């Protein structure tokens, strides 16, 4: 059975109390009513966070008259928090679960994702994290942020430029470019080791890393031979294999979910456009033609779509097209600089950077109802990369 509801295009800080309705967009989703009991302040926090998670899922929506009724009881424990949940429909029980942990937001996200899965069979993204670069007057920070009011956590700070982070499929590493040594070198931060090491430092540019789906290789941009080209990098041996052989600039690679193709940017016709080639190199096929500037491609997890940045009317916006180049759809309309799109792990959301509220920040858009939410806080933030499912 399918349910119809109205979702609004909104802009708000993640975890904020108020959403700002802008443009109503019809979407199909399952209505869920929430009843949260227990400690008053704690229950209020849980109700707000779970409601935000549900409304941003793209599959469910909160409603006073829901197909499913979720009853949640929250309490404090000596070790943190406890949450007992019961979900029913028409009086028939659908799921009963208990959660314990040190952080109430983590429990809320876990329940929200379980609820999405139990009602739809699809994975939720409430428990996932996003990493991005933040620039302040002191320098540059590689930060990771959960989808709630908790502040971002800096995993690396430098007075020199940090850019183009890419989260590994196993969740343990983020590879990024740093100018710490005076050159644009590739570094790798490991969560398990809580440290970063330099992994590639050939003369010139070492940037725009993109992991293969199996984590066995990275597509990177190197300018070791004069102009920028796409190379494959082995993350264990650090050996490189050149894939593009043109005199033009080739950059911003991204793997298809099968790992057999790479989409990238090239200015071989005089301005940046998107091309696709086999992951072993060879002949490329041009994918874009409707805009004079296209960059930053990102392939969806299901392989059906490619998100990218394109210039239109003097401004830069986020677009999505089918993997064959057809069915082009513009996603952003506010601001003048919307770029760096990256897909969430379920393919229902895209993170990107934008100046739509005046300052450059990281946003997320839910593609079913076109709901937009700001994730980053203060400072100039950009270059998001999404964690895989299961990262904690």
Question: Which residues fall in each region the model found?
Answer:
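A structural "domain/chain start" motif
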Residues: 16-48
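Hydrophobic beta-strand positions that form the internal "hydrophobic ladder"
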Residues: 130, 174, 215-219, 259-263, ...
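Amphipathic beta-strand/beta-sheet edge segments enriched in Tyr/Trp
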Residues: 67-114
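Structural motif
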Residues: 81-82, 138-143, 183-187, 227-231, ...
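C-terminal/domain-edge helix-coil "capping" segments
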Residues: 17-30, 100-156
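Multi-bladed beta-propeller domains
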Residues: 146-161, 190-207, 233-249, 277-293, ...
């Amino acid at each position: 059975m399918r349910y119809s509801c109205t979702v609004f295009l909104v802009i708000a800080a993640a975890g904020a109390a108020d959403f700002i309705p802008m443009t109503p967009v019809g979407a199909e989703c399952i209505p869920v009513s929430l009843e949260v009991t227990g400690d008053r302040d704690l229950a209020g926090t849980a109700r707000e966070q779970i409601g935000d998670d549900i409304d941003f899922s793209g599959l469910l929506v909160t409603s006073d008259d829901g197909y499913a009724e979720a009853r949640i009881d929250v309490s404090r424990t000596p070790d943190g928090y406890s949450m007992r949940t019961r979900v029913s429909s028409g009086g028939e029980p659908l799921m009963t679960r208990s959660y314990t942990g040190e952080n109430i937001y983590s429990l809320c996200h876990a329940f929200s994702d379980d609820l999405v899965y139990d009602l739809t069979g699809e994975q939720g993204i409430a428990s996932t994290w996003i990493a991005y670069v933040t620039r302040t007057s002191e320098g540059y920070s590689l930060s990771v942020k959960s989808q709630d009011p908790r502040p971002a956590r800096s995993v690396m700070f430098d007075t020199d430029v940090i850019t183009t982070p890419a989260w590994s499929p196993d969740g343990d590493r983020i590879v990024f470019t740093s100018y710490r040594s005076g050159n644009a070198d590739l570094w790798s931060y490991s969560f398990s080791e809580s440290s970063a090491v330099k992994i590639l430092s050939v003369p010139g540019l070492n940037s725009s890393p993109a992991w293969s789906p199996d984590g066995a290789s990275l597509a990177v941009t190197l300018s070791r031979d004069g102009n920028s080209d796409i190379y494959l990098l082995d993350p264990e041996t650090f050996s490189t294999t050149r894939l593009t052989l043109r005199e033009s600039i080739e950059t911003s690679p991204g793997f298809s979910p099968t790992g057999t193709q790479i989409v990238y940017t090239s200015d071989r016709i005089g301005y940046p456009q998107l091309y696709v080639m086999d992951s072993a190199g060879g002949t490329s096929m041009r994918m874009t033609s409707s805009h004079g500037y296209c960059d930053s491609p990102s392939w969806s997890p299901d392989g059906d779509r490619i998100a990218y940045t394109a210039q239109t009317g003097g401004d830069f916006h986020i677009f999505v097209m089918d993997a064959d180049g057809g069915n082009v759809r513009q996603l952003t309309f506010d601001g003048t600089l919307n770029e760096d799109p990256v897909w969430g792990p379920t393919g229902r959301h895209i993170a990107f950077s934008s100046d739509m509220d005046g300052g450059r920040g990281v946003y997320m858009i839910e593609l079913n109802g076109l709901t937009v939410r700001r994730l980053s806080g203060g400072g100039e933030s950009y270059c998001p990369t999404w964690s895989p499912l299961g990262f904690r």
